[in-house]
From Swiss-Prot:
NCBIfam families: ATP_synt_6_or_A. It is found in: Cell membrane. One of its GO terms (cellular component) is proton-transporting ATP synthase complex. Belongs to the ATPase A chain family. This is ATP synthase subunit a. It comes from Rubrobacter xylanophilus (strain DSM 9941 / JCM 11954 / NBRC 16129 / PRD-1). Pfam families: ATP-synt_A (PF00119). The chain crosses the membrane at residues 38-58, 94-114, 118-138, 193-213, 215-235. The keyword Magnesium does not apply.
Length: 258
């Protein structure tokens, strides 16, 4: 059976969208569509696992730690050392948030690797919402610590040459940068997770369309890429969390930086 490239692409995307719309509970309130679909189910599952992992870890501390407590303590140490105080020790107070964000995204990424699940972080609406939350926290912390006027003035160096001309230009470029940060956060996580799952799906779909002989090539490639996706799941969660911490601290210490 011969299948054109266009037909294969259409079938893959159709199957991907069908998976997203599975398990739907249709719900509409005041004309607003609040239907619960597959991404929402797995988002709730990821949030529940993250909460239980951290709650149980905090409630079961012992003088003689078991394996679970050791894991929790090592994660806490990892978050304190890797996320806390990227620019200044005062910024360390935000590492619990960054660590929680890392664990949450890692859980969602790993869940998405299981058969018949859904990779929530491959949904641009979810990653954009998280990135928007980071943007709001960043601006809030910058204004709270420095004051609105001082924070906005810090967006361009005070000692620029030809200041009347260069200061507005540099300030405007920094304004664009502030909006670019959440955009790149959202797109980086979304694109990396979506691309990885689509590649695995394509490799396995080749068996259905071109017959069993292609399995000898498709399956090994899919397995190797699946293992690589585990690494991607970890690194993308880490990148999102560490950049969130850095952006918040850059806003906190904006005046000192200039």
């Amino acid at each position: 059976m011969e299948v054109t490239q266009e037909e294969l692409r259409h079938e893959i995307l159709h199957t991907w969208e069908a998976a997203r719309e599975a398990w739907v509970i249709h719900l509409e309130i005041a004309g607003i569509n609040l239907s619960i679909n597959k991404p929402v189910w797995f988002l709730w599952l990821g949030a529940a696992i993250t909460f239980l992992f951290m709650y149980v870890g905090a409630r079961t501390l012992r003088d003689r730690p078991g394996a679970y407590q050791v894991l929790v303590e090592e994660l806490f140490r990892f978050g304190r050392d890797m996320f806390g105080g990227q620019i200044n020790e005062e910024g360390r107070k935000w590492f619990p948030y960054s660590l929680t964000l890392f664990i949450f995204l890692l859980v969602l990424n790993i869940i998405g690797l299981f058969p018949n699940s859904y990779p929530v972080t491959s949904n641009i609406s979810f990653t954009a919402t998280l990135a928007l939350f980071t943007f709001v926290l960043t601006q809030y912390e910058g204004v709270r610590r420095n004051g609105l006027v001082t924070y906005l003035k810090s967006w361009a160096p005070a000692d620029l040459p030809a200041k009347p001309l260069m200061y507005p230009i540099m300030w405007f470029l920094h304004l664009i940068q502030e909006f670019t940060k959440p955009l790149t956060l959202a797109l980086r996580l979304y694109a990396n997770i979506l691309a990885g799952h689509l590649i695995i799906f394509v490799f396995l779909s080749l068996i259905l369309y071109f017959g069993l002989p292609t399995a000898f090539v498709s399956v090994p490639f899919a397995v190797v890429f699946y293992a690589f996706e585990i690494f991607v799941a970890v690194i993308q969660a880490y990148i999102f969390a560490i950049l969130t911490q850095v952006y918040i601290e850059l806003a906190m210490f904006a005046e000192e930086a200039h």
